[in-house]
Amino acid sequence: MIVVGQLPPENNISELLKSISRKHNVVVLSDHLSNIIVDDNLHYDTIIISSSETELKELAPDLLITIGGHTVSKKIKYFLRTFGVSEHWHISNSGDVVDTYQQLTDIIKSDNETFLSYINELSPSQDEAQNEAESYKELWNKKRALLTAPEIKYSDLYAVGMLLSSLPENVSLHFANSHSVYLSQ
């Protein structure tokens, strides 16, 4: 699993993440602050909220790779802290320690694009590990397929949804605080 936190706009890694997700069956979760759009981006907060403890244990990754800075989602923080990971690698050009999920095992000193390019160039394995990756990604996709968008009129959530759906392509929108970011996810 790759979790993408806060990044500047024009960070040039969206296409790499899409390719890695497809080629290696990697689940990519990107925060709105990441300025990343991945085709199969999952609504992970909703998946986490709607999952039982047993399901959350199954959804927890063995390997977590994090790039970027902060994530707004308290749900992803809770999920990864509570259900843990075997390995957590944070990619940092400066080597700074960011242990948001309190599971950090390694810091890889590299810029995001170089690291992701290296991963993308690896040949997908045709063994048990690849089958396991496919099954893991399929778990997330099945949970996503079960989600339906509620239409709760006269609520903050509904108002933000209507606003976002009416915005033109390639518009920049500034959110003033984490609650508005949360509602937009």
Feature-to-residue mapping (PLM):
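Glycine-rich, anion-gripping cofactor-binding loops and their flanking helix/strand elements
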Residues: 4-89
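Phosphate- and divalent-cation-binding pockets in alpha/beta enzyme and binding domains
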Residues: 11-12, 74-75, 118, 162, ...
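Short loop/helix-cap segments at secondary-structure boundaries that form the rim of catalytic
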Residues: 32-42, 95-103, 184-185
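Phosphate/pyrophosphate-binding active-site segments
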Residues: 80-181
